[in-house]
């Protein structure tokens, strides 16, 4: 699995485990993700996938590195998808 596929899987898992927010984002704590059996089977390096997703501005969390135990209560936010582009009205 390449990085893009792992990020897509990460998004799916955050949707599954997280809570939908009023702005369309999803929130989940690092501990919930890290300790989930399904996530453990999918991601060889969850922290690396999270960092790659953060770099692409798909997720947000404080700091650069999350560690098991120490950061279990840190919230990870899956940002809402961008709105579809507005259709340009044809002028006559």
Curated annotation (Swiss-Prot):
SMART domains attached to this UniProt entry: Costars
Name assigned to this protein: Costars family protein ST45-2
GO BP term, example: regulation of actin filament-based process
Keywords of this entry: Acetylation
Modified-residue entries (N-acetylmethionine), positions: 1
Family: Belongs to the costars family.
InterPro entries (UniProt xref): Costars (IPR044302), Costars_dom (IPR027817), Costars_sf (IPR038095)
Species this chain originates from: Eutrema halophilum
